[in-house]
């Protein structure tokens, strides 16, 4: 009986772990989900953004004490403007999505919300990590050898 309980706990912990994408795996997935060239943003820029926002980790979160918001998932989408975590004061929820949906291994919801973010006037510049690490840089290395 004890062995079954331990096995159950191990299996439970495996199911809640986030996925850390390999660079090319992410590039292929983002391409399939329609991000390559979306709103004029190249696939390499999206992969660069994900690298510096989350390290390609779907389960990444970052709490921002200044405004009591949290960034979620592979693109670190913020609960102040884009998703609903039920905790952020004055949240907008422009993507009409639960923030927990942005932590799934299947990143379709995260991509859909990222498309919403990049559709705003600020575009890809909404992401600080993109401005700091990808803007005006040769980002071709992020898709090199990926066959995309």
UniProtKB/Swiss-Prot annotation:
Lysozymes have primarily a bacteriolytic function; those in tissues and body fluids are associated with the monocyte-macrophage system and enhance the activity of immunoagents. Also plays a role in digestion in this species. Lysozyme C is capable of both hydrolysis and transglycosylation; it also shows a slight esterase activity. It acts rapidly on both peptide-substituted and unsubstituted peptidoglycan, and slowly on chitin oligosaccharides. Disulfide bonds join 24-146, 48-134, 83-99, 95-113. Residues 19-148 form the C-type lysozyme domain. Keywords: Antimicrobial, Bacteriolytic enzyme, Digestion, Disulfide bond, Glycosidase, Hydrolase, Secreted, Signal. InterPro entries: Glyco_hydro_22 (IPR001916), Glyco_hydro_22_CS (IPR019799), Glyco_hydro_22_lys (IPR000974), Lysozyme-like_dom_sf (IPR023346). This is Lysozyme C. The active site is at 53, 71. Its EC number is 3.2.1.17. CDD domains: LYZ_C. GO terms for molecular function: lysozyme activity. The keyword Repeat does not apply. Monomer. Belongs to the glycosyl hydrolase 22 family. The lineage of its organism: Eukaryota, Metazoa, Chordata, Craniata, Vertebrata. Its main location: secreted. PANTHER family: LYSOZYME C. It catalyses: Hydrolysis of (1->4)-beta-linkages between N-acetylmuramic acid and N-acetyl-D-glucosamine residues in a peptidoglycan and between N-acetyl-D-glucosamine residues in chitodextrins. GO terms for biological process: defense response to Gram-negative bacterium; defense response to Gram-positive bacterium; digestion; killing of cells of another organism. Residues 1-18 form the signal peptide. GO terms for cellular component: extracellular region. It is found in: Secreted. It holds the Pfam family Lys.
């Amino acid at each position: 009986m004890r062995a079954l309980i331990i096995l159950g706990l191990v299996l439970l912990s495996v199911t809640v772990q986030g996925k850390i994408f390999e660079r090319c795996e992410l590039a292929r997935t983002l391409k399939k989900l329609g991000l390559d060239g979306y709103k004029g943003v190249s696939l390499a820029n999206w992969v660069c953004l994900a690298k510096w926002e989350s390290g390609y980790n779907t389960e990444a979160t970052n709490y921002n004490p200044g405004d009591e918001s949290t960034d979620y998932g592979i693109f670190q989408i913020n609960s102040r403007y884009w998703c609903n975590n039920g905790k952020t004061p004055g949240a907008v929820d422009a993507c009409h999505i639960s923030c927990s949906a942005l932590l799934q291994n299947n990143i379709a919801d995260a991509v859909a919300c990222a498309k919403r973010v990049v559709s705003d006037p600020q575009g890809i510049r909404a992401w600080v990590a993109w401005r700091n690490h990808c803007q005006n840089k040769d980002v071709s290395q992020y898709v090199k050898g990926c066959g995309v």
